[in-house]
C-alpha cells in the first residue's frame, strides 16, 4: 500500500486524514476522550441512551451491511495460512470488525459501544491501519468483571475496549492458521470444527476402550498464571514480524481496570474475554498435549480442563504425579491439588456431563452432571417464576 506523509503521520494513499484511536490521545496514550466528543469531531451519529432501541438496531444492521459490501476481498481466505505480518493484520481489520459486531458484547473501559465504532469506521480505519503499521498502536485498558462459577466462587473476565477487540480478532485470524494444523487432535476447545460435543465423544470412546479410570487435572487460575516470556518465545518460533510480536506483548500487558476503578499492572496471564485469548491459551497448552502424546496417554483437553484416561487407579496416581511435575516445573503453571483427583469417570464431571459404564452391556452412557441438573432447574425457575409460585 503506497503511503504519504502528513504532519509526521502515515496516511494511506487515497485515505482520509486518520483520526486518533478512540479513547486515546495522539500516539495511543494520554487521557481518555469521551465517545460523544469523538463523535462530534467526526460529525457522525452514534448510539446513545436517548436513541430508541429499534432505531439503533436498524441503523447498526444497515451499517453492517454497508461495511460488509464495501470490504475488500481477502488476499487469503480466513482459515488459510498467510504471512504473519502486521500488513496482514491491518488488511483484515474490517473482517474482524464484522466478527466482533456479530458477537456483540459490552463496552470496555473507554465506554465506546460497537454501534459507535460501526458509525465511525470509515474515518477510524485509515488511522488505525497507519498506527499498526508504524508500531504506534497502544491498546487501552481491560475492564475486569467477575461472574459466578458453576462450582462456586467467581471467574474473572477481562473486557477490552471494542477497538482493541477488533485488533485482537484480526490478529487471531492471522495467527490461527499457523498453529491450527499442528494442534493435537485431542484438543477440542476454541478450535474450528471442534466443540464440547467432540470432546465428550472422544472421552466416551476412551472409556469404551477399557480405560475406566480418569486423571482429572485442575489447573489453578490457569488464565491468570500464563508466563508472558514463555508465550512470547512460543510465538516467535512462527512469527518473524517484530511489530506483531510487540503488539501481542502490549495486549498481554494492558492495564486492568478493577470494578472499584483501581488500575493495576498486568505482568502475567492471558485475560479471558478477548478474541485472542483462547488461541493463546491453546498455544501455551499445546506443549502439554504433545507431552501427553509422547508418553502414550489417552486424553481429552478442552481449554484448561484436561482428563487423562488410564486402566487402573494405581496407574492414575503414577500419571498424576508425573504430570504435576511437568506442569509445575516445565510449564510454570500450578495444579490445584484440592480439585484434582484420580477417580472413575462417573464420579467426575467433564463439560457438564458424566460418563457411566453400564455393567450388563459394557457400554458407556453420557449423563448430565448433578451440577448441570441443578443449574438447569434454576434456569427453568427463573424463566417460569409464576408457575413455581403457584405450586
Protein language model features and the residues they cover:
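Short, compositionally biased low-complexity segments
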Residues: 61-73, 88-105, 142-144, 172-178, ...
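A conserved non-catalytic segment of reverse transcriptases
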Residues: 253, 330-391
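Conserved phosphate-binding loops in nucleotide/dinucleotide-binding enzymes
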Residues: 156-161, 366
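Non-catalytic, polymerase-adjacent accessory regions of viral genome-replication enzymes
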Residues: 1-122
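Duplex nucleic acid-engaging cores and interfaces of nucleic-acid transaction enzymes
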Residues: 162-170, 204, 232
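Conserved polymerase palm-domain catalytic core
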Residues: 124, 131-146, 150, 174, ...
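Phosphate/adenylate-binding "loop-and-lid" substructures adjacent to NTP/NAD/dNTP-binding pockets
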Residues: 94-97, 106-154
Amino acid at each position: 500500500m503506497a503511503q504519504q506523509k502528513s504532519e509526521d503521520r502515515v496516511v494511506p494513499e487515497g485515505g482520509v486524514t486518520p483520526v486518533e484511536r478512540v479513547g486515546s490521545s495522539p500516539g495511543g496514550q494520554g487521557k481518555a476522550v469521551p465517545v460523544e466528543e469523538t463523535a462530534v469531531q467526526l460529525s457522525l451519529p452514534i448510539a446513545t441512551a436517548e436513541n430508541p432501541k429499534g432505531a439503533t438496531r436498524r441503523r447498526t444492521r444497515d451499517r453492517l451491511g454497508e461495511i460488509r459490501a464495501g470490504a475488500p476481498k481477502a488476499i487469503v481466505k480466513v482459515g488459510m495460512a498467510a504471512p504473519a505480518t502486521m500488513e496482514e493484520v491491518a488488511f483484515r481489520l474490517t473482517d474482524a470488525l464484522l466478527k466482533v459486531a456479530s458477537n456483540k458484547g459490552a463496552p470496555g473501559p473507554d465506554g465506546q459501544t460497537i454501534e459507535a465504532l460501526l458509525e465511525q469506521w470509515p474515518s477510524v480505519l485509515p488511522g488505525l491501519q497507519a498506527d499498526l503499521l508504524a508500531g504506534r498502536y497502544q491498546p487501552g485498558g481491560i475492564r475486569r468483571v467477575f461472574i459466578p462459577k458453576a462450582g462456586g466462587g467467581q471467574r474473572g473476565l477481562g473486557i477490552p475496549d471494542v477497538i482493541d477487540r477488533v485488533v485482537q480478532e484480526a490478529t487471531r485470524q492471522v495467527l490461527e492458521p499457523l498453529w491450527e494444523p499442528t494442534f493435537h487432535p485431542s484438543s477440542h476447545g476454541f478450535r474450528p470444527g471442534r466443540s464440547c460435543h467432540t470432546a465428550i465423544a472422544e472421552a466416551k470412546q476412551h472409556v469404551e476402550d477399557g480405560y475406566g479410570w480418569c486423571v482429572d487435572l485442575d489447573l489453578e487460575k490457569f488464565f491468570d498464571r500464563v508466563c508472558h516470556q514463555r508465550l512470547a518465545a512460543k510465538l516467535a518460533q512462527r512469527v518473524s514480524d517484530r511489530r506483531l510480536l510487540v503488539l501481542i506483548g502490549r495486549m498481554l500487558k494492558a492495564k486492568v481496570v478493577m470494578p472499584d476503578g483501581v488500575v493495576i499492572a498486568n505482568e502475567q496471564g492471558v485475560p479471558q474475554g478477548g478474541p485472542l485469548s483462547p488461541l493463546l491459551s491453546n498455544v501455551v497448552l499445546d506443549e502439554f498435549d504433545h507431552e501427553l502424546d509422547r508418553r502414550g496417554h489417552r486424553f481429552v483437553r478442552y481449554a484448561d480442563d484436561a482428563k487423562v484416561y488410564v486402566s487402573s487407579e494405581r496407574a492414575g496416581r503414577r500419571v498424576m504425579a508425573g504430570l504435576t511435575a511437568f506442569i509445575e516445573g516445565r510449564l510454570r503453571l500450578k495444579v490445584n491439588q484440592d480439585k484434582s483427583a484420580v477417580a472413575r469417570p462417573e464420579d467426575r464431571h467433564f463439560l457438564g456431563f458424566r460418563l457411566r459404564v453400564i455393567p450388563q452391556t459394557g457400554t458407556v452412557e453420557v449423563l448430565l452432571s448433578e451440577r448441570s441438573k441443578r443449574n438447569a432447574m434454576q434456569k427453568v425457575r427463573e424463566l417460569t417464576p409464576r408457575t413455581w409460585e403457584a405450586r
